[in-house]
Amino acid sequence: MPDVSQRIEALREQIEEANYQYYGLDQPTLSDAEYDALLQELIRLEKEHPEFLTPDSPSQRVGGYIAKEFPKVRHAEALLSLDNAFDAGDLLEFDRRVRALVAEVEYVVELKIDGLTVALTYEDGALVRGATRGDGEVGEEITANLKTIPAIPLRLRKQADRLDVRGEGYMPKGSFLRLNQEREEAGQPLFANPRNAAAGSLRQLDSRITAQRKLGYFAYQVLTPEEGELASQTAVLDYLKEQGFSVNPEYRVFSAIEEVIAYCGEMVEKRHNYPYDIDGLVIKVNDIAQQRELGFTAKSPRWAIAYKFPAEQVETVVEDIVIRVGRTGVLTPTAYLTPVFVAGSTVGRATLHNLDNIRAKDVRIGDHVLIQKAGDVIPEVVKILPEKRTGGERIFEMPELCPECQSPVIREEGEAAHRCTSITCPARQREAIIHFVSRNAMNIDGLGPAVIYQLLEAGLIKDAADLYALEYDALVPLERLGKKSAENLLKAIEDSKERGLAPLIFGLGIRHVGEKAGKILAQKYGTMEDLEKAQVEELQEIPDVGPAMAQSVAQFFQQESTHHFLNKLRQAGVVMSAQHSAKPQIFAGKSIVVTGSLQRWDRHYVETMIEEFGGKAASSVSKKTAFVVAGEKAGSKLAKAKELGIPVLSEEEFAELLP
């Protein structure tokens, strides 16, 4: 039926053109009623003639796919975070560092949308994968949900062999207010702010729910342009618009850092004038060649920085000061406040850090205080308002006994922290488990603090290693679980056994050992057994491992309780070696590019194999490329490889290299 297929294709073109005009150019050409009529006709025709339905049809934006879980996906290149600037001095220092390497520089300044980073992959012009940022290296695939966002094109307007795009998913203020109103009427808990609502919406297993949330997306970065080299960030933004993406129009170009600083000051006053939340500005070196010259640190690009708006300050009252015992035994005083709305959410508590901080600020129970969110995230007390004191305020004293276990509290010389002396303190054990299961550690989804409290109270666990001995029949009766949740939890626990050495080291909660240090130690020693034998002297020789960390690591592994805990993990089958150590590193130190349409495997699988065997799956061809794996319809990357004299392998030739 050529007439039906032609009508379907015409409808798709009309709808996608309308999406581009509305979201890409901000120039709507159809009324809502006209748009809805076209979409409903398309849905009806595709339902009557399913043989013409395609994955990139705009009808797929209404949702309908229900996922069982979100599979993990490794990003083509790591999604690094940005260094932060909080004032003019920080921006001047950033400019000094840049100009030390490049003399003439132009900056482009973009709005920092308060949402969540989303990575998109297009192959042969079609959207094939979308993922969350995750830990920067591995995220969750949420393609079906992202297809429901009209600002994300399902097919590029210009053909491209491969295109990796990064941008920010967000919820407009209007959508957020409507959603919370609906939830309030339904008796459901409200979202604290649009960012949380967007994050929750993108992680819905039912894509129809995501479609109803009316999310937005602004694209800002391209990793693999196929139309030659893009010379500047502004050229990248223009290219993205040409390809059908929604690009935030509020960007400016400046040639002097003083102009950037002045613009930042202007935007502090205008930050609330937009239909979406912004929490700062992103300043980038505009020239792409200069970006490459400046390069990256381990955590962030040297050519970009995020200017964070000054924190909004609000007055409230300290109703009480309560002690919380952490996983390392530190007693942290927390101010319980009269709830107030600040920087996008209601705040009822704020950390006071330690007794020295309380004394320095002279915070007392009953005080009127100004609070803010440090970095717009963590609530803190800025200062007291002494003129509002009545004389009834009470001075806080640090307890001499742990409020959780009544063990003595000590303060070691040279430290600001007070600590519980008992390693069996229930609060320390509870917080240690919460840390162990956290996303950047063992990443056991569905095991939040409330469930952990239940497991402890029911006597089902005493430490994190006991999680691996949990059984279905013991979980189902618990209040917050049930059959399906118990199944999902046990699967998440089982999956965590394969997390590898670096997350496990971080999850152990060793004092001074953060996520980065966990990766360094895993790379250095390769197995938990070798790390357990490490001495202070050899640990101190490792770059980025100082004396305090070395001493802490050595002492941790000397404890009998540590050996007992690790043995329980071993018996449960938890992997205690670096993930890469299981396979020969035949591609170690090699940068490899995959391009074109493959027949035997999909491209992402080949890139994963390259990394598992020690190589780097690069997104562009350069002189440093070891070789290119080329499938059918390989485009500009193949041409560039031939131009540079870089070896080109077929899919079969690549397969022969594998052990």
Swiss-Prot record:
Superkingdom classification of source: Bacteria
Gene Ontology molecular function: any one: DNA binding
Binding site for Zn(2+): 402, 405, 420, 425
UniProt-listed Enzyme Commission number(s): 6.5.1.2
Substrates-to-products reaction catalysed: NAD(+) + (deoxyribonucleotide)n-3'-hydroxyl + 5'-phospho-(deoxyribonucleotide)m = (deoxyribonucleotide)n+m + AMP + beta-nicotinamide D-nucleotide
Swiss-Prot/TrEMBL GO biological process terms: DNA repair; DNA replication
CC cofactor: Mg(2+); Mn(2+)
UniProt-annotated binding residues for NAD(+): 32-36, 81-82, 110, 133, 168, 284, 308
Active site residues according to the UniProt entry: 112 (n6-amp-lysine intermediate)
EC supergroup of this enzyme: ligase
CDD domains named among the record's database cross-references: BRCT_DNA_ligase_like (cd17748), LIGANc (cd00114)
Keyword Ligase: yes
Pfam families per the UniProt record, alphabetical: BRCT, DNA_ligase_aden, DNA_ligase_OB, DNA_ligase_ZBD, HHH_2, HHH_5, Nlig-Ia
Any one GO cellular component localisation term in the record: cytosol
The keyword Ligase belongs to this UniProt entry's keyword annotation: yes
Keyword terms, alphabetized: DNA damage, DNA repair, DNA replication, Ligase, Magnesium, Manganese, Metal-binding, NAD, Zinc
Ranges where the BRCT domain occurs: 582-659
Role: DNA ligase that catalyzes the formation of phosphodiester linkages between 5'-phosphoryl and 3'-hydroxyl groups in double-stranded DNA using NAD as a coenzyme and as the energy source for the reaction. It is essential for DNA replication and repair of damaged DNA.
Family the UniProt entry places it in: Belongs to the NAD-dependent DNA ligase family. LigA subfamily.
Protein name: DNA ligase
Gene (name only): ligA
